Amino acid sequence: MSTFKLMMDGRLVFAMAIAILSVVLSCGTCEKAKRAVRGRQDRPKEFPPPRYNYTILTRYNATALASPFINDQVKNVDLRIVTATRPCEMIALIAKTNIDSILKELAAAQKTYSARLTWFKIMPTCATPIHDVSYMKCNPKLSFAMCDERSDILWQASLITMAAETDDELGLVLAAPAHSASGLYRRVIEIDGRQIYTDFSVTIPSERCPIAFEQNFGNPDRCKTPEQYSRGEVFTRRFLGEFNFPQGEHMTWLKFWFVYDGGNLPVQFYEAQAFARPVPPDNHPGFDSVESEITQNKTDPKPGQADPKPNQPFKWPSIKHLAPRLDEVDEVIEPVTKPPKTSKSNSTFVGISVGLGIAGLVLVGVILYVCLRRKKELKKSAQNGLTRLRSTFKDVKYTQLP
């Protein structure tokens, strides 16, 4: 009997251990359970004042979410690179946009605007909304998101204690993200129907961080396909949770939890490094596209003239425009012999030589002329019987003897 009782007690203890283990696993990790209740025990000493006073209206959450997938391949999407250098690091997804120019345009028209800011985690076949908020009755003379009304601030539940908006509400701060948080994030800002896309390629080290929460962004209940977005079936209210804390208060909590877990706060958050996305080959502005554009700008031919050449499709330049023909190669490769350039010293020497030669010829001509004339005079004197002699020589006079 005692043996049976011991066996029953052992089974009971084992069953209790299994139950406790199941509860712990259902919470995820001990750190998750700790983080879920610690807010009741510890609080930050003070919170910053609200950035702007606004009213939350739930009805704005009833609008279907537009697709984050871009069908227009020509559309320019800003791509940023964010890399964590070590585990358990706090990183920021920050990128400037041309929102200011849009707001100035709206301010010039003296009209308010509505906006929507949504963050997505892009997966291979679907996209998961992780943060969504709508803004209404916005004054374009103020900074973005300073609006009189807004929707509930919706977050993916597992990100509430590890993510928050930056001070301008355009960036995203991740505290100690796990390796599973690596990948592509897309920020979509919609202002009066105009959409601004920004991609962030995030890399997290594979080393385990003890305070990080693993994420399952591929959950089919939240990760929606392009077809679901196109049919207007995605409503973030159905699978995202409310967290209507003002931005400053949420960021204060995030930093408090991060330091409480042993993290080191960065001194400052910097804008993510930009990456030049390559142009798709089908849209490369090559020779044929320029020729096509010129053809499109031509006027219609007059009656009796041949039809113009049809427009060329956008494509890479053909090989004949990239490499010369064989005869052109021969012409280019064939060496061209040019006479050597004459230096300045050689030109001077030649000039002097020519001058001396001319002077010599003139001198010889003068000598010949004098000699011929003297010879002619002597010959004339001989014919007259007179010989001309010098009459003086060193002040001594001589007289011709008989």
UniProtKB/Swiss-Prot annotation:
Signal peptide: 1-30
A Pfam family assignment: Herpes_glycop_D
Alphabetic keyword roster: Disulfide bond, Glycoprotein, Host-virus interaction, Membrane, Signal, Transmembrane, Transmembrane helix, Viral attachment to host cell, Viral attachment to host entry receptor, Viral envelope protein, Virion, Virus entry into host cell
Gene Ontology CC terms, in alphabetical order: membrane; viral envelope; virion membrane
Topological domain spans for side Intravirion: 373-402
Residues annotated as glycosylated: 53, 61, 297, 346
Protein name: Envelope glycoprotein D
Gene: gD
